[in-house]
């Protein structure tokens, strides 16, 4: 276990002032007779430390910058103390052991005795007061003059703990520099073999026996904190983590090993902004959504397409939240870029199975994005410039240590690239996008926090001055968080999100038109967290969503146009839910979680509704009545119970098995004629004639942490089966743009999907990254006794996004602290397609005969990316820090097929392949920020 120089001063930890009598001699204080076997022979020192810490359950502390390089030589089993002395004394090092299996190596005097009563000033009571001297306690040891002493934290008081054997211990984990809360930090209690993970506010809590406990606090990219907690009564404390500067730009996926092995969660991935710094991306733009595509079970139909498919489900079964605000279009330029500026994102959590009960309304996945909070200490700024985008971020305190703001802006200047094209249509086109994020945080005392978040994004695309697309996302969320005590809390959120789309087409003057639609999502949610019941974590609450869908206006664009005006009006629906869940630790090895969510969806007027003959196709000739409903009159109600059940059994601390079952209801879906999400897609509510979608998912997984070759690895394998009833498919040849009665253009049926996902991740060393492989199959079945209500003759067919095989390899190699190289290798099976297979003549007319639905596939997809990152100097005192990233997207220049289309030419059918990126895309990006690399 090594630390960079800004945290290593603890090597003076047993001061010359207090312990001068021990100077200039090797010390083995309270040494343990740990046996080291011949298996350690010929290991480098770094590999020896990794292996020893993992297998011998010890922690070795030393100063890496000045440490010599050598190989361990051991011919027979020997004591650890003797082995270290033989190899290190000749370099002038002294070694000490303490009672907690910590090994200290230093050229300075060492003692491991803690002065009694030294920590009296660090007692923490129930009032959530901060520990004194934050600058001092941000490391593993507290400094007094030149002395460092292993730290103990006392929680509560003896008086408050009288007649009690247990106590509730809670606290907050924060960044040592910015003082921002750290979400997803792990608090592990080694003596009890369990732990906790901090929530969005950096808060944690658990019940402990009174007495002393060894606690380890860790987080991606931060230095690990090891402390001894002396629990006297109920109490709380704050702990500050510093950045682990030695792991420069290390790419990390998932929160930490405790989430994977110890929690009941399945199908969950956490992505931090550190994960995307070195991932090579098109045009040099950081993109957290593109990084998500490198995870197992996540696919897209092709480059330049919006949305993606999770475990075989369509794109409309995913829901994105950023700070509780739903976003209904997550892309810029029709899918080339994400609509989320990665500079303002703190972390991104993906739930693809065992979705928390507080979320509902989507069958496949929930993407929960957390925006950064502003710096409460000082004002700062950062930004970057790439070939087609520029971005800037501002943050700072509104009131120091109490409230803060952060504002991120991003825009494009891509038209110059289009002007370079030889094709006149492209040369006359234009494309622009931008987005803005503002996040304001206010702490109202120790128990209340208010967060105000706003988001705006826009896109404008003019295609050869003939067709113009405009679409916008705009919304705000207000979240109030209240702590009742150290362990129980309440969250209240109020949000509104609006998605606007408009299209203008003047390709043909007499048929020129303008078309627009809009979706409004207004939501209120109240959620309670109860953690003061032993071995239980309870969450319950309610939420309600008002959907208002402006289905579309269709109007002539000019006086020459012969298009008739048409307004489809507005539809409304209210989706409400009550939910409760409990995570129950039955034993140190077995934990279960269960939840219920009751949904009620009400479809409201004003609306005219067709009534069709029972059990007959929904076509105009089968209409027997039309019902007229007034404004806010109930047209139709649907209800259902969602289930969440999961269990985790730990065979040991590094190996577990998990099982889970989910049921979900979905009351809103997407209407689109294209395979990929195009800007002109429309959202539609379940109504009188269209039932809600209901889905079940079953999953099982094995999770491992292992140590091999001096490095740690995380391994997981998950299998799943999911089915959905009442999925919506579009009839062949249906016109969706201004269809007043969508049930006449759609059919409902069944979806089945199953698959296996394998993930291997290397966490340590100069070379790190991950590899994953996914095998999956997805099929749809639309059957009926009536031919017009069948697709593919009622026979199951592969879904449009079915890709059985997919693998991703992501690697990063750090040559030096300032230089790193990373690369991706991406492969997937081509998606299904329906081919014309023959020409036949009917009544003298040529007719094409097509294959079965999605019987064939386009060519397989393969791509290699590469990037080189160079950091500026790592001086501590500097005005600003800069870095350069050179990246190549599609290094091999492979012409991956986005689609295959056919033309009838000279009496035969010719097939053509359309590629989005048929050559390498090279980019150079400059990033800057005020301050040094660490802050």
Residue ranges and their predicted role:
Residues 49, 56, 91, 107-166, ...:
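Short, acidic, small-residue-rich periplasmic hinge/interaction motif at the N-terminus
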Residues 131-160, 197, 221-223, 235, ...:
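Periplasmic N-terminal accessory/gating domains of Gram-negative outer-membrane beta-barrel systems
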Residues 192-203, 636, 640:
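Short, acidic Ser/Thr/Gly-rich low-complexity loop/linker segments typical of extracellular
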Residues 388-411, 424-460, 468-492, 496, ...:
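Transmembrane beta-barrel wall of Gram-negative outer-membrane proteins
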Residues 495, 650, 658-662, 668, ...:
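Membrane-embedded beta-barrel scaffold of Gram-negative outer-membrane proteins
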Residues 541-654, 785:
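Signature of Gram-negative outer-membrane beta-barrel scaffolds
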Residues 720-723, 742-837, 927:
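Gram-negative outer-membrane beta-barrel transporters
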Residues 726, 730, 818-821, 826-845, ...:
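C-terminal beta-signal and adjacent terminal beta-strands/loops
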């Amino acid at each position: 276990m090594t630390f960079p120089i800004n945290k290593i001063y603890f090597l003076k930890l047993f001061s010359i002032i207090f312990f001068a009598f021990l100077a200039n001699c090797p010390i083995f204080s309270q040494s343990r007779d740990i046996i080291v076997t011949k298996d350690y022979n010929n290991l480098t020192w770094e590999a020896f430390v990794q292996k020893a810490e993992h297998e011998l359950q010890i922690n070795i502390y030393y100063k890496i910058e000045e440490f010599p390089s050598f190989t361990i030589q051991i011919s027979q089993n020997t004591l650890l103390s003797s082995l270290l002395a033989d190899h290190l004394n000749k370099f002038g090092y002294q070694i000490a052991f303490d009672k907690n299996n910590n090994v200290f190596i230093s050229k300075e005097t060492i003692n491991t005795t803690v002065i009694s009563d030294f920590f009296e000033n660090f007692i923490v009571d129930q009032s959530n007061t901060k520990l004194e001297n934050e600058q001092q306690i941000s490391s593993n040891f507290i400094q007094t003059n030149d002395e460092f002493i292993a730290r103990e934290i006392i929680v509560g008081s003896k008086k408050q703990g009288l007649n009690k054997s247990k106590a509730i211990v809670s606290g907050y984990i924060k960044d040592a520099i910015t003082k921002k809360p750290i979400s997803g930090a792990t608090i592990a209690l080694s003596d009890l073999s369990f732990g906790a993970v901090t929530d969005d506010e950096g808060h944690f809590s658990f019940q402990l026996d009174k007495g002393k406990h060894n606690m380890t606090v860790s987080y991606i990219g931060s230095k690990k904190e090891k402390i001894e907690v002396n629990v006297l009564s109920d109490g709380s404390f704050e702990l500050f983590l510093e950045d682990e500067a030695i792991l420069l730009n290390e790419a990390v996926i998932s929160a930490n090993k405790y989430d994977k092995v110890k929690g009941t969660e399945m199908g969950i991935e956490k992505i931090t902004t550190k994960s995307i710094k070195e991932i090579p991306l098109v045009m040099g733009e950081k993109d957290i959504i593109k990084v998500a595509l490198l995870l197992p079970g996540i696919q897209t139909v092709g480059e330049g397409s919006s949305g993606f498919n999770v475990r075989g489900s369509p794109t409309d079964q995913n829901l994105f939240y950023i700070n509780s605000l739903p976003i209904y279009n997550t892309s810029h330029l029709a899918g080339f870029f994400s609509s989320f500026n990665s500079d303002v994102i703190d972390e991104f959590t993906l739930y693809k199975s065992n979705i928390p009960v507080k979320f509902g309304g989507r069958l496949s996945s929930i993407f929960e994005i957390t925006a950064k909070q502003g710096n409460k200490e000082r004002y700062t700024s950062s930004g970057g410039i790439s070939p087609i985008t520029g971005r800037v971020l501002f943050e700072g305190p509104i009131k120091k240590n109490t409230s803060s703001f952060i504002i991120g802006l991003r825009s494009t200047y891509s038209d110059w690239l289009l002007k370079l094209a030889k094709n006149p249509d492209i040369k006359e086109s234009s494309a622009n996008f931008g987005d803005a994020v503002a996040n304001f945080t206010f702490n109202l005392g120790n128990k209340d926090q208010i967060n105000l978040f706003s988001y705006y994004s826009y896109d404008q695309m003019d295609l050869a001055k003939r067709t113009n697309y405009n679409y916008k996302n705009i919304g705000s969320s207000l979240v109030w968080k209240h702590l009742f005590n150290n362990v129980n809390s309440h969250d209240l959120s109020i949000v509104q999100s609006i998605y606007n789309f408009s299209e203008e087409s003047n390709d043909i003057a007499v048929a020129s038109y303008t078309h627009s639609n809009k979706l409004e999502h207004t939501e209120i949610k109240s959620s309670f967290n109860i953690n003061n019941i032993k071995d239980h974590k309870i969450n319950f609450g309610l939420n309600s969503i008002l959907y208002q869908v402006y289905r579309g206006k269709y109007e002539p664009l000019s006086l020459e146009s012969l298009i008739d005006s048409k307004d489809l009006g507005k539809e409304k629906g209210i989706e409400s839910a009550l939910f409760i869940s409990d995570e129950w630790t039955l034993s140190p090895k077995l934990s279960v979680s269960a939840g219920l969510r009751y949904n009620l969806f009400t479809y409201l007027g004003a609306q005219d509704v067709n009534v069709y003959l029972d059990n007959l196709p929904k076509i105009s000739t089968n209409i027997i009545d039309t019902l007229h409903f007034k404004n806010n009159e109930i047209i139709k109600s649907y209800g259902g119970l969602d289930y969440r059940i999961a269990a985790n059994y730990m065979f040991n601390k590094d190996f577990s098995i998990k099982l889970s079952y989910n049921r979900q209801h979905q009351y809103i879906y997407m209407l689109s004629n294209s395979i990929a999400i195009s800007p002109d897609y429309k959202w539609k509510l379940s109504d009188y004639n269209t039932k809600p979608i209901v889905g079940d998912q079953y999953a099982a997984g094995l999770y491992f942490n292992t140590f091999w070759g001096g490095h740690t690895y995380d391994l997981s394998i998950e299998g799943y089966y999911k089915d959905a009833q009442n999925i919506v498919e579009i009839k062949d040849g249906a016109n969706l743009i201004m269809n007043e009665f969508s049930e006449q253009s759609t059919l409902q049926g069944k979806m089945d999907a199953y698959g296996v996902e394998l993930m291997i991740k290397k966490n340590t060393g100069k070379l790190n990254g991950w590899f994953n492989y996914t095998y999956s199959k997805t099929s749809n079945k639309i059957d009926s006794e009536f031919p017009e209500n069948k697709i593919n003759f009622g026979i199951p067919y592969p879904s449009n996004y079915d890709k059985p095989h997919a693998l991703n390899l992501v690697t990063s190699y750090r040559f030096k602290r300032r230089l790193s190289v990373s690369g991706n290798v991406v492969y997937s099976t081509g998606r299904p397609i329906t081919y014309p297979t023959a020409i036949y003549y009917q009544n003298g007319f040529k007719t094409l005969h097509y294959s079965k639905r999605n019987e064939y596939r386009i060519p397989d997809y393969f791509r290699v990316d590469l990037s080189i990152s160079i950091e500026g100097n790592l001086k501590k005192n500097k005005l600003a820090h800069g870095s350069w990233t050179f990246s190549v997207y599609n290094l091999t220049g492979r012409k991956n097929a986005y689609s295959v289309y056919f033309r009838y030419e000279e009496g035969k059918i010719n097939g053509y392949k359309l590629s989005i990126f048929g050559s390498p895309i090279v980019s150079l990006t400059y990033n800057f920020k005020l301050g040094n690399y660490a802050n």
